[in-house]
A protein has these predicted regions:
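Short, conserved charged micro-motifs
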Residues: 176-179, 274-278, 336, 392-396, ...
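Hydrophobic, small-residue-rich alpha-helical packing segments that form membrane-like cores
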Residues: 194-199, 212-216, 220-222, 232-234, ...
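Sec-dependent signal peptide recognition
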Residues: 2-8
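A common structural junction motif
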Residues: 185-192, 284-292, 402-413, 638-645, ...
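Active-site His/Glu-centered metal-binding helix of metallohydrolases
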Residues: 75-83, 581, 795
Length: 968
């Protein structure tokens, strides 16, 4: 009998080994991918990348908004949220007692969702709220996030689109088994708990989308082009009515139907042994039961849509600036003709040499124009967007866009552009291969869209064989008169509804409790990974050039890409004309090249040149294929010092700038950014220190260019990352980059300083929306101290840094007050400056008071638990142990350290000190540096919808206009 048992075990092991050795691969695959299919249909995509001991993981479920029931739109998305709530084994301290309450909540929602009488609904919701509180007594909030923090995962998140729901983790390479055990339990045994508070978080996400006018345009375009397909019939976030009337039963059925192995792919890129990884995945996911009906469910969607025969014009309204979008139906990403979509996108709009770039943007015929694909699995929408100049109608913009489409159809483009497109695709591929997330995401895209990996590997080679005649023929077949035309107007959206907040009792979170499942995972011993700290003396070089400028050098021995930066110690605070000059030069040619030729040459070389100006320095960046570096450096020199001024171009730029300034006041996020800078730095800040309209009009464009040319006279640091050896690069750059023999030194760190907050006050700026953006900002003038950084890191991790932190639990999990909330003790950019502290939240207008009260409570009486401290410490320690500062990041790390007066990697101090920090030390930090602070409350919102009495109780209210915070 024993022999039979042993034989069975050996046989099972052999079968497992045989299964793990069966995989698909493709010749000449730069990622050397392995693709496995388990017996239950689960797809596993693996690619090894040894850059650092971490692994990017994506678990992709081939289901999204298009698969939502017509009467439960938004379902796939809020199931994504619920997947973080745990299982029967974690997220609970007694599932047997919790389950009857959860079942009762489920049944009440089935009654609630069909009731229309407001009083009846309120009474039922009160029952749901009461039961939810009782159920929370047996739940443990955020145990999934505790698990991820405990194993050192980063980037815990998920996303839902029309075609996929995908779950992301970036894990240490020694935690594969723990990760697999957690995920298999999560995907087989999901439990819906904390439902009504999470639904409020989803609704807050919906509120944020209501001021996203671009989203409205895309959704309207889809509805026109695909009226018989879910792409056009429903949205990923769902309707307001459906979100407020959910069905837990329907969500469970959705999970049962779609979250099955033969509809899922595990996609991984990083440092691992693929044989070991597939064995672990087979161990934990191999017994997952498939659903034989999932293919028929997927195939139930309509395959074709009746094409339009004439333009279908729609109008949408919202707070942002006017624009127009034209859209054409294209084949889906799984179609071979999708190759044409990629190349047409580049021909029309690539940022430099496309038809839109040259004929519309460079020629300043519109404020801005762009084109690109909204590529989906079953169908795609090719979109063009245009924003009008001052006095220009949307119809004028429409005509200009259509004229460029006609040029494409007529073949009125240079055939050599096709070769340049291929070179740029190769450059983009090199960049993607450096990133584990990009590599793993390519797997997700292939799986979701049903694309054979061989086709993906051969994509660039295949596209390179497409001829100009092929493109013209295809363009004429798809760019017909049957297109969607969406006019976006400024105004109130009639489809929006104002919904009052529900009465929610904060649920129990039990931060001090831990389920046995979590305890077992956290106690599992894994082989330690030792940290490797960057050594600036060994991992890079610092040298002085002949003119005493500095060179920071790091060799790229990975691929054929280069990066050069000229960081010039003169910024907008010293010269407010620089920003305008950097913008102006983008429209100009040189003594050798017209503006169009210059941009086309850059694109042909597959390289970039950019000018950016911040308060203390100007950065000129060059990047691209290393084989073309010398040509690009020469082009940049010619551009900087011999740009050909043009009065007409400048006059157009001024007019467009004034229009763009007016438009900026219409965007909620932009308004909040300006409010934040105004309140934190004062009326004179990076945003307001700009030329007035009168100064713009009075400026002589010839004089403006001198501000760029004269940058050569100022001290600069040259940063190089590329294949060239240091001696060779030094000789080359000294010979080919024009600089003064005796550059003028400028004070480093000439930036705007944070304003102290000696007393509480409220600064209120107007914006008419369903939600507020709010920051509580505090500066008690505490100067930077390097020895305080470990405590700061630990406090941020514990208090406000992520989904396992206190802020997330109290504001979102327990109360459903926000989709996004955070708090940070911030480290200044320079050693001369101060630490500051802020909280941040986006919430429905009538939840403002609750948000403020909750922040006050946890800021001044911070819950302190040993288990949460240990998790915060573990997360920091594992993150540092497995992160590697490599490639161009070494140079960035050096600059950051030097700005703080350090000559070493501060991560070493954090790692060595955090491991020994106690709960008492954390509480002492909170008492000394956080508790009892005074704040400036920054609020962007509609005052008519806010509790002004609450604001008055906080401190004096200062109402500021958009004109004040924008400076015009």
């Amino acid at each position: 009998m024993k022999k039979l048992i042993v034989l069975s075990i050996v046989t099972a092991l052999l079968v497992s080994c045989q299964q793990s050795s069966k995989y698909e691969s493709v010749a000449n695959d730069p990622m050397k991918s392995r693709i496995y299919t388990l017996d239950n249909g689960l797809k596993v995509y693996l690619s090894v990348n040894k850059d650092q001991p971490r692994i990017q993981t994506y678990i992709a479920v081939r289901v999204g908004g298009k698969n939502d029931p017509r009467n439960n739109t938004g379902l796939a998305h809020y199931l994504e949220h619920l997947m973080f709530k745990g299982t029967t084994q974690f997220g609970t301290n007694d599932y047997a007692k919790e389950k009857p309450l959860l079942d009762e909540i489920e049944q009440l929602y089935e009654v609630y969702r069909v009731k229309t009488d407001p009083e009846e609904r309120k009474a039922i919701y009160h029952q749901i709220d009461s039961l939810s509180y009782e159920a929370s007594k047996y739940a443990i909030a955020n145990e999934y996030d505790k698990l991820m923090a405990g194993i050192g995962s980063e980037g815990t998140n998920a996303y839902t689109s029309y075609d996929v729901t995908c779950y992301t983790e970036d894990i240490p390479s020694n935690e594969v088994e723990n990760w697999a055990k957690i995920q298999s339990n999560r995907f087989k045994d999901m439990v819906i708990r904390g439902f009504h508070t999470e639904l409020e978080a989803v609704y807050e996400e919906k509120n944020i989308s209501l001021t996203d006018d671009s989203r409205k345009m895309y959704e309207t375009g889809l509805s026109v082009l695909f009226p018989n397909h879910p792409y056009g019939q429903q949205t990923v976030l769902g309707t307001q009515d459906h979100l407020k009337n959910p069905s837990i039963t329907t969500i469970k059925n959705h999970f049962k139907d779609w979250y099955v192995p033969n509809n899922v792919a595990i996609c991984m890129s990083g440092d691992f042994d693929p044989d070991e990884v597939i064995s672990v995945i087979n161990q934990f996911f191999g017994d997952w039961t498939p659903n034989p009906a999932v293919d028929s469910l997927r195939n139930a969607l309509p395959k074709t849509c009746e094409p339009l025969t004439s333009p279908d014009v729609r109008e949408v309204y919202g707070p942002e600036s006017e624009r127009i979008m034209l859209g054409w139906a294209f084949p889906g990403k799984k179609d071979k003709e999708a190759d044409y979509l990629d190349i047409i996108e580049e021909l029309l709009y690539n940022g430099k040499a496309g038809l839109f770039d040259i004929d519309l943007n460079q020629a300043q015929k519109v404020l801005s124009a762009g084109a690109g694909s909204y590529a989906l699995t079953d169908h795609s929408m090719f979109i063009t967007i245009g924003m009008p100049k001052e006095g220009q109608s949307l119809d004028d913009v429409r005509a200009l866009i259509l004229s460029e489409i006609t040029k494409l159809k007529n073949g009125e483009f240079d055939a050599t552009l096709l070769e340049a497109i291929i070179n740029n695709m190769k450059r983009q591929q090199m960049q993607q291969l450096e990133s584990n997330s990009s590599r793993a995401n390519m797997f997700v895209e292939a799986f979701v869209n049903g694309v054979d990996w061989k086709d993906e590997v051969e994509r660039i080679d295949r596209i390179s064989k497409i001829t100009k005649d092929d493109i013209v023929r295809f363009a004429n077949s798809v760019f017909t008169d049957g297109y969607s035309c969406v006019y976006k107007h400024k105004g109130v959206d009639p489809n929006e509804k104002k919904i009052e907040k529900p009465a929610i009792s904060p649920i129990e979170t039990h931060r001090d409790k831990t389920s046995q499942f979590v305890t077992d995972i956290l106690n599992t011993k894994v082989k330690e990974i030792e940290p490797v700290f960057v050594d600036f003396d060994k991992d890079m070089s610092v040298a002085k050039l002949s003119n005493n400028n500095e060179l920071l050098y790091k060799q790229n021995d990975v691929n054929g890409l280069f990066n050069i930066q000229y960081r010039i110690a003169r910024g907008s605070k010293a010269d407010k004309y620089l920003s305008l000059a950097a913008e102006y030069i983008d429209y100009l040619g040189t003594s050798k090249l017209t503006p169009e030729q210059l941009q086309s040459e850059l694109y042909r070389l597959a390289c970039n040149i950019s000018f950016s100006v911040n308060s203390d320095e100007t950065i000129i960046s060059l990047s691209g294929l290393a084989e073309n570096m010398k040509d690009v450096v020469a082009l940049c020199e010619n551009w900087m010092h011999e740009a050909q001024s043009n009065q007409t171009v400048y006059d157009n730029l001024v007019a467009d700038n004034l229009k763009a300034r007016a438009d900026a006041k219409l965007e909620q996020k932009n308004c909040f950014l300006r409010l934040r800078r105004w309140a934190m730095f004062g009326p004179l800040n990076e945003s307001t220190n700009i030329l007035s309209a009168e100064e713009l009009k009075a400026t002589e464009p010839d004089e403006l260019l001198k501000h760029i040319d004269e940058l050569k006279n100022y001290e600069q640091t040259i940063i190089y990352y590329g294949p060239m050896k240091q001696e060779e690069f030094t000789e080359f750059i000294e010979k080919n980059h024009e600089v003064s023999a005796s550059p003028t030194a400028t004070i480093k760190g000439d930036i705007y300083k944070n304003i102290p907050t000696p007393k509480n006050q409220v600064i209120l700026a107007p914006y008419d929306a369903k939600n507020i953006y709010m920051i509580m900002y505090s500066n008690n003038e505490q100067k930077y101290q390097a020895d305080l950084i470990p405590q700061v890191e630990l406090f941020n991790e514990y208090f406000g840094g992520g989904m396992n932190a206190l802020v997330f639990q109290e504001l979102r999990e327990a109360r459903g007050l926000a989709y996004s909330a955070a708090a940070y003790y911030t480290v200044p950019e320079f050693k001369e400056d101060e630490f500051t502290f802020y909280t941040y939240i986006i919430s429905q207008n009538d939840k403002m008071g609750d948000c403020i009260d909750t922040f006050h409570k946890i800021l001044n009486d911070m819950p302190a638990t040993e288990s949460s401290l240990l998790l915060a410490k573990e997360a920091i320690m594992k993150r540092i142990a497995t992160q590697r500062t490599i490639k161009r990041n070494v140079l960035s790390a050096y600059i950051e350290a030097r700005n703080h007066g350090l000559n070493y990697d501060i991560s070493r101090d954090i790692y060595n000190k955090v491991k020994n920090m106690s709960l008492d030390e954390l509480v002492d930090f909170q008492h000394q540096y956080v508790k009892g602070r005074t704040y400036t409350y920054l609020i962007l919102g509609n005052e008519a919808d806010l509790d002004v009495a609450k604001l008055q109780s906080l401190g004096e209210i200062h109402r500021v206009s958009l004109e004040e915070i924008f400076g015009y």
